């Protein structure tokens, strides 16, 4: 497994198109990514790959679906068991530390509970919800899962 201390270099090496602000954010949030991923039983590299695919490390981004922050969490989907019954606003989710924490909690919960430990199904569920679990093979066709896996492979394979 790769170690997170090299994330800055790996993203710089494998994604030269990233702007200097994005690369700075990778470095800036490494510690939080490592802490929250470990606390939630997921690989830091996987969480970093999710953040890259979701927001390219832009903390202020809001999608057309009202997903907010680095991990692109939709506020209305917070407040359940995934987030320990805490409801978050878009403003709160734009805080990088909060976004990393909440994204890690949701990804971990989805993978453990809904996907029964299956990483790709958990990633699909994080992005597209229940159809990833109920529609047989849906997760295998997910472009999102393929993107995250590609980024993850570069991070892990780049060491």
Language-model features and meaning:
Residues 42-58, 73, 100-104, 122-128:
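Short, functionally critical alpha-helical segments immediately adjacent to catalytic or ligand/cofactor-binding
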Residues 88-99:
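A short, structured beta-strand-centered segment in the mid-to-C-terminal lobe
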Residues 27, 31, 45, 97, ...:
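A structural signal for well-ordered alpha-helical segments within the folded catalytic domains
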Residues 105-113, 128, 150:
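Short basic/hydrophobic patches in alpha-helices and adjacent helix-turn junctions
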Residues 2-57, 97:
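Export/targeting segments at the very N-terminus of extracytoplasmic proteins
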Residues 56-62, 110, 129-139:
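Secretory-pathway/luminal and periplasmic proteins that interact with or process carbohydrate-rich
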Residues 64-86, 103-105:
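Substrate-binding/active-site groove segments that recognize
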Residues 117-159:
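Catalytic and substrate-binding regions of cell-wall glycan-acting enzymes that process beta-1,4-linked
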């Amino acid at each position: 497994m790769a170690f997170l201390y090299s994330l800055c270099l790996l993203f710089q090496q494998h994604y030269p198109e990233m702007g200097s602000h994005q690369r700075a954010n990778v470095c800036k949030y490494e510690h939080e990514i490592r802490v929250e991923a470990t606390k939630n039983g997921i690989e830091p590299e996987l969480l970093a790959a999710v953040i890259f695919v979701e927001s390219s490390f832009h903390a202020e981004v809001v999608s057309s679906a009202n997903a907010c922050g680095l991990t692109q969490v939709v506020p209305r989907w917070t407040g359940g068991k995934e987030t320990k019954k805490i409801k978050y606003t878009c403003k709160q989710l734009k805080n990088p530390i909060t976004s990393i924490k909440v994204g890690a909690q949701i990804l971990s919960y989805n993978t453990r509970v809904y996907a029964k430990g299956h990483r790709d199904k958990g990633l699909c569920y994080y992005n597209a919800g229940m159809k990833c679990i109920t529609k047989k093979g849906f997760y295998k066709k997910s472009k999102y899962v393929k993107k995250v896996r590609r980024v993850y492979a570069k991070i892990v394979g780049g060491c």
